[in-house]
From Swiss-Prot:
Keywords carried by this UniProt record: ATP-binding, Ligase, Nucleotide-binding, Protein biosynthesis
Complex formation: Heterotrimer of A, B and C subunits.
Keyword Acyltransferase applies: no
HAMAP family noted in UniProt: GatC (MF_00122)
Species whose genome carries this gene: Streptococcus pneumoniae serotype 4 (strain ATCC BAA-334 / TIGR4)
Name used for this protein in its record: Glutamyl-tRNA(Gln) amidotransferase subunit C
Gene: gatC
Length: 100
């Protein structure tokens, strides 16, 4: 499946990213190769392979959910260039609060 430069540009715009024409062309080529590989994997005969089979021999180890003391707020805000009460002000990324 061929990914076009227009599709790369569209997704980049949704992500608020900008790329040069050369970068966009390179991304389109690379993404096309990745999609082709995924499609090729879809053709592999997995008859008799259990859906939950994994090659990794790992267990999920969860830690207990214990409240811990966080960062000292006043110390943190000493490094913040712009704040409003205890909120960190950052530049807007959406025009007029619009959607992505």
């Amino acid at each position: 499946m061929k990914i076009t430069q227009e599709e790369v540009t569209h997704v980049a715009n949704l992500s608020k990213l900008r790329f040069s024409e050369e970068e966009t062309a390179a991304f389109a080529t690379t993404l096309s190769k990745i999609v082709d590989m995924v499609e090729l994997l879809g053709e592999v005969d997995t008859t008799g392979v259990a859906p939950t089979t994994t090659m990794a021999d790992r267990k999920t180890v969860l830690r207990p959910d214990v409240a811990e003391e966080g960062i000292d707020r006043d110390r943190l805000f000493k490094n913040v260039p712009e704040k409003d009460n205890y909120y960190i002000k950052v530049p807007a990324i959406l025009d007029n609060g619009g959607d992505a």
